[in-house]
Amino acid sequence: MPELPEVEVSRMGISPHMVGQTIKAFVFRTPKLRWDIPQELKLLEGQVIRNIRRRAKYLLIDTDQGTAIVHLGMSGSLRVLDADFPAAKHDHVDLKLTNGKVLRYNDPRRFGAWLWCAPGESHAVLEHMGPEPLTDAFNSEYIADKAQGKRVAVKQFIMDNKVVVGVGNIYANESLFKSRILPTRQAGQVTPQEWVLLVENIKATLKIAINQGGTTLKDFAQADGKPGYFAQELLVYGKAGEPCPECGEPLQELKIGQRNTFFCNECQQ
């Protein structure tokens, strides 16, 4: 599943080709992805793309007449191509530009989304979200306060979008390992000093992943079609049974909140 770094890499990849360009037409090859594709997106035809933003794992394509909101779901990807490039299987949405280019959305599992939001309004999918992890609003004081009295596992806690957005499964596993915190520990039992380290590692891990082009495990590709290379940097994710890179003991695996969780019983407390 594309997580925050992969979505940010997609934003960085498509923005230079799209901001300032005019939308010529939308082409929908399916009426529905995760949800019905709103016909209001057609209102954006003829509009200039003013900006492309990211909020959590959503991309927001802004015009004066509203915003197209894109979620990559489990297997979605975006590429900027020549408009006459033939559509392939699973190419479900085209956003055609007047400069002869097209933003093409491919999604084999069709669990992503294209939504629309009127000017000056906020879509329901973007409400009740915590701060972005790479901003100053996400800091150890903030999250330590949020965690007081919480009995939920710390891994599940930092993956809660109401607490902080965009800390997906891969990056939660890696950050907890680097911080030597067991993912099963109750969030309320994490000390202030440990929160300082964990916040630092979450930020650092996400930044490295963005610089590496994200993590390609199966479906994700960058806007130019290239894979992300952060998978080569993974310390514990997907490595159950392999030696811990710190102590050599076999890495463990269990499920927390239905998500695969990888850790070292010796190094993490």
UniProtKB/Swiss-Prot annotation:
A UniProt-annotated Pfam family: H2TH
Entry similarity comment: Belongs to the FPG family.
GO biological process: base-excision repair
CDD domains in alphabetical order: EcFpg-like_N (cd08966)
Species, as recorded: Vibrio parahaemolyticus serotype O3:K6 (strain RIMD 2210633)
Note describing how the cofactor binds: Binds 1 zinc ion per subunit.
Residue ranges covered by zinc fingers (FPG-type): 235-269
InterPro entries: DNA_glyclase/AP_lyase_DNA-bd, DNA_glyclase_Znf_dom_DNA_BS, Formamido-pyr_DNA_Glyclase, FPG_cat, MutM-like_N-ter, Ribosomal_uS13-like_H2TH, Znf_DNA_glyclase/AP_lyase, Znf_FPG/IleRS
Recorded GO MF terms: 8-oxo-7,8-dihydroguanine DNA N-glycosylase activity; class I DNA-(apurinic or apyrimidinic site) endonuclease activity; damaged DNA binding; zinc ion binding
Xref: SUPFAM superfamilies: Glucocorticoid receptor-like (DNA-binding domain) (SSF57716), N-terminal domain of MutM-like DNA repair proteins (SSF81624), S13-like H2TH domain (SSF46946)
Enzyme Commission number(s) from the entry: 3.2.2.23, 4.2.99.18
The UniProt record lists the keyword tRNA processing: no
Cofactors, names only: Zn(2+)
Catalytic activity: Hydrolysis of DNA containing ring-opened 7-methylguanine residues, releasing 2,6-diamino-4-hydroxy-5-(N-methyl)formamidopyrimidine; 2'-deoxyribonucleotide-(2'-deoxyribose 5'-phosphate)-2'-deoxyribonucleotide-DNA = a 3'-end 2'-deoxyribonucleotide-(2,3-dehydro-2,3-deoxyribose 5'-phosphate)-DNA + a 5'-end 5'-phospho-2'-deoxyribonucleoside-DNA + H(+)
Binding site for DNA: 90, 109, 150
SMART domains reported in the protein's UniProt record: Fapy_DNA_glyco, H2TH
Assigned keywords, A-Z: DNA damage, DNA repair, DNA-binding, Glycosidase, Hydrolase, Lyase, Metal-binding, Multifunctional enzyme, Zinc, Zinc-finger
Active site: 2 (schiff-base intermediate with dna), 3 (proton donor), 57 (proton donor), 259 (proton donor)
Purpose: Involved in base excision repair of DNA damaged by oxidation or by mutagenic agents. Acts as a DNA glycosylase that recognizes and removes damaged bases. Has a preference for oxidized purines, such as 7,8-dihydro-8-oxoguanine (8-oxoG). Has AP (apurinic/apyrimidinic) lyase activity and introduces nicks in the DNA strand. Cleaves the DNA backbone by beta-delta elimination to generate a single-strand break at the site of the removed base with both 3'- and 5'-phosphates.
Entry protein name: Formamidopyrimidine-DNA glycosylase
Subunit and interaction comment: Monomer.
PROSITE patterns: FPG_CAT, ZF_FPG_1, ZF_FPG_2
